[in-house]
């Protein structure tokens, strides 16, 4: 999966995989957004695992001298967002991700009417 990635997004995906993140998804937003180039979305089973995934990614970011703009949601550990400027990482507990996807689907259905 990570063979086609380079640079920061590759490091993020590898760091997440190192902590057994699952359902890892990389979205290329370069043609769709002026705010970031990629979203990396992944899941963990518990608050502790989600925080461990975030810690692993942050360690890799610091080692590689990339810029961290902000971290949101770390304390609660249900949905952590790491803004690395060119890559925004969303790390969900699996139930929170499922609910988030349901909300997005509902919003799309309601906005199409």
Model-based region annotation:
Residues 81, 85-105:
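C-terminal structural segments of small proteins and small subunits
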Residues 107-111:
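Conserved small/polar residues in nucleotide/adenosyl-binding loops
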Residues 1-5:
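N-terminal presequence-like segments and adjacent domain-start helices
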Residues 6-38, 45-47:
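N-terminal first-folded block
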Residues 39-41, 81:
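Short aromatic/hydrophobic contact patches that present stacked aromatics
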Residues 48-66, 81:
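Compact, glycine-rich, soluble single-domain proteins
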Residues 13, 17, 21, 58, ...:
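Signal for well-folded cores of large energy- and translation-related assemblies
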Residues 23, 27-33, 69-86:
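Glycine/charge-rich, flexible interdomain linkers and switch-proximal surface loops
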């Amino acid at each position: 999966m990570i063979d086609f990635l380079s640079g920061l997004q590759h490091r993020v995906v590898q760091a997440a995989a190192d902590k057994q993140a699952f359902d890892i998804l990389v979205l290329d937003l370069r043609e769709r957004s002026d705010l970031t180039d990629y979203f990396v979305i992944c899941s963990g089973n518990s608050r502790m695992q989600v925080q461990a995934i975030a810690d692993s990614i942050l360690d890799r970011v610091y080692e590689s001298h990339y810029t961290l703009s902000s971290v949101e949601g770390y304390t609660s550990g249900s949905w952590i967002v790491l803004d690395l400027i060119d890559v925004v990482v969303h790390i969900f507990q699996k139930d929170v991700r499922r609910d988030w996807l349901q909300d997005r689907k509902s919003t799309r259905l309601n906005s199409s009417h």
